[in-house]
Amino acid sequence: MSKIPVFKGSFKSWLAKNDEKPAKSVLLEPKYRDHHEKIRNKENMEEGEKPVFVSMANPQPTREDYERYDEDRRLKDKARDLRIARRRNSATPEASPSSDQYFTPEPADDEFVTPSTSKKSQKPRSSDATPVSSKPPRYLPRTPLSEQYTSCLSRKMEENFSRMQELMISGHSPHEARQQTIQESSEQLEPRAKVTRSSSQPPPIDTLKPRVPRIESPLVKKTTETPIRRTSYVDTLVATHQIQLQYSDRVVVGVERQMTKLESIKNLAAANRSPIIAEEAKKRRNEAEAVRKLIEVETQNAKKRAVIQELKDRIDKLTQAQLAIHQLVSSQPFSGDPYNQRLLRSIDNWMALPFREFDIQTAREMLELARKMKITIDHFRNVATLHRNSKSLNRSLNTSRKSIAVKINPSSQLNQQSSSDAAPPPSMREASTQMTSRLAESAMTQTSPRRIGVEPLDLSQLLEKHNSSSQTTPPVVEPVLAEVSAEPQRPPVTLSMTAPVSTIAEFDSMLNSISLHNESLETVAEPFSRLKTDISFPSTVEETTPRSGRVSLDSESARRLSAGLSHYLEQVKKERESMEAQESESESMELEIPVVSEVSVTTESENLEEVVSEHSDSKSPETLVASDNGEDSSGGSEDPNATQFEHEIEEHKEPEKLGLIIDPEDEQDETKRFVNHDEFEQSLEEELEPRGNNDSADDSGFLLDNSPAPRLKSIFDNLPPAAASAAVTDTPRVPAEADETTFAGMDMEEYCQREFLKEISPIMVQKAIELQDELRGVDWLTAQDVWQPPSFKDVQMEFDDNFEYFDSFSILIWSAVVDLINKNYLKFGRKMTENEEIAFEAEALKMLQTEHGPESRKSEWCTDVKMSKKLEGMMPMELDYRYDVRRGLPDAEKQKYQWQQVQMTVIAARYANKNLINEANEVYATEKEKLGQMVLESEIDATVTDV
């Protein structure tokens, strides 16, 4: 471009020509001017070309600049990494890092953030770097950087002031002191070899305000750079200005401080000259000191009182919590923590301790109490969980307090009296235990050291005149009558108010001998036994019953029972086969044995039960039946080959007995034999109905019956209500009316993605912003604890089989929100700004719509839930684990397995938790009432008859 042209002609003509045109900052020759105007009017520009306007007044870096800078930085970083890697892998040993040519100290910020050019995000402290006015800044932050500005000048000033101080104390006038100080300081000229600049020259701008503070190298550098090299005239001016601002600010403060000090020193010197004033001043000082001390002691005492009160409150809270736990697990009187009691008694005397000691002691106690409180809270949580889970196991009136077992020790006098009497008949002996186990052969194994406190009451001596409540057999009357008639008839004594004192004392001793023991009465091993580990119930050895005394069936004894049953059934089966084979021979026997009706069969089985419970011998039930019904089996019992060995006798007698036991109707269905309809109204068939009358415990397809399992109903069928009612499915949970109105073919997936997502998204985003501190660095699983997204139960209770779809979806989107806020917004441990909150809200809503909304391609969560539904329907846990073993077996063996399976199902039904608990509850209630009542009656009778 040539020189700026001077317009030929007058100014008026130029104005007339250029009046309408926009003014140009630079006057151009005509050939350049046209080109510029074309660009300005965006004529014949290339496609990607942009007109570039640069304003020198306020230059702003564009995005391209930043990108270029960023790229450059990345290249340098890469090169540095390469160098460092090469150095690391090289064989030569490393020199000291400072002298190492590859050593690059780490910058303070590890992450490069592209600078934002908006005014809003400017830091409030940016005014420190660039002074906005010529005034000195009001507050100067005390940073390590500001230490760099202290230099020889301020040091000199301080030295001069201290010198003046000394001179004035020694009695010079201020003027003299000043003169002398100036003179002395000008004489002291320190030799300065290193500093090469004049005193007005400030240090270079780089050391003044470094952009990125570098970590200083640990070793001293060999070469010292001359700092003048990089300074320019402008640098010097700016730095001088800054230093003047700093110094003027500091000097003002310093001078004021020094002047006040000098003033007080002058006053002090004057006071020293006149002793009366000095005395007064001293007196005043002492008074002020005394007042100050008094106030300090008072404030300290107030603080001590507050701390002591807080300690007392904490101890009180702790005691309350411990009392609550104690009441839940025990009925013993509560005695608090003895250490806390001692502390409460002695804590008021701590006021006398010096403050530091007091502080240490109370802090220790606070820590200790906090620790105890934490332990107590954990303990309480465990107890509460235990009680919440054991609702069904609680005894009387289903209160949450553990029930109380009655233990009755009969008085010593009664024992002496009854021991002299004759032993009771064997039929009465059964009252010694509270519950008889169903089968005498199965000895229970003890699986755990935990015991329960049902006391075995041996009341056989006391109950001679009464029937026991837990008897299963009608009492044999004759021997009892004989004994009663043998006793001398005592005249009945009436109880009256005028009874002698001895009677009352007897009553007292009798009542004292009834002691209550707080023990849980559960007869079933709990599913949540781990929660009980830290709760110890008070018990001693003699008060507890071993596991074998309870009616519960652990796995070992269940196996043994099933083995016994299968053995027994095998025998029955063999007998049936042999009987069919010998039908022709046994016709004569059938004539001898009367045809047994159903009634007689039931009485037989009753007798069998009686005999089993009465005799604890190891005889088999068949032998016992034979010995009971001697007349029935007399024909077969006189066998010529009979030997003296018992087991051989049993073998000979078995064929006839089996004929008696098996009922012809029952032979068809073996399962009926094991269901006890008297004990539990619910029969086995009813219990298994939901599985579609399929009795087998597996799906192996050749065992009991292979009727296909009913189709699982799902909410994804999308059938209209008419078609749905026509389809053959399980009974739907929702009634038909509700189905047509509320639930007309609603697809849960569609509902979640369309309606529910719209409603819940803003709520979730707000929650994430509110709880940002708790959500920082949290994964999706823990995020459910910070805020629980709504579950299906909260929203609607009617269709409870849809909850998996709904719940998994709400958890999914909440997790997505948490992940997003953690990934992009919660950085560096600071709170989000308003702008960031707005940005996050928009981004999160958009993300939820695109990724989880109706048009999103991702619906894996749905297929997952469907899959788990399917698996649940298949019941893979119930597939029989012996299936593979059994595949290659012959039919007879398969039949054997089928029998075993029947037994297993029956045992499971018979010894189900629920049944056992109900049974134990009933027995407990009746036993408690009847036994207590009878014992009291017999004791009162005995006491009265003695008198």
UniProtKB/Swiss-Prot annotation:
It is found in: Cytoplasm, Cytoskeleton, Microtubule organizing center, Centrosome. Residues 20-148, 173-211, 407-453, 575-594, 600-662, 681-705 are annotated as: Disordered. Keywords: Cell cycle, Coiled coil, Cytoplasm, Cytoskeleton. GO terms for biological process: embryonic digestive tract development; mitotic spindle organization; protein localization to organelle. Residues 580-590 have a biased composition (Acidic residues). GO terms for cellular component: centrosome; cytoplasm; protein phosphatase type 2A complex. Residues 276-320, 563-591 form a coiled coil. Residues 90-102, 179-188, 430-449 have a biased composition (Polar residues). Disruption phenotype: RNAi-mediated knockdown causes defects in spindle assembly characterized by kinetochore microtubule instability, a reduction in centrosomal microtubules and a decrease in outgrowth of microtubule plus ends from centrosomes. Also causes a reduction of sys-1/beta-catenin enrichment at centrosomes throughout early embryonic cleavages. Increases sys-1 nuclear accumulation without affecting sys-1 asymmetric distribution in E and MS blastomers. The keyword Cytoplasm applies. Interacts with phosphatase regulatory subunit rsa-1 and tpxl-1. May interact with spd-5. May interact with sys-1. Recruits rsa-1 and, thereby, phosphatase let-92/paa-1 complex to the centrosomes. Recruits sys-1/beta-catenin to mitotic centrosomes during the first embryonic cell divisions. This is Regulator of spindle assembly protein 2. It comes from Caenorhabditis elegans. The gene is rsa-2.
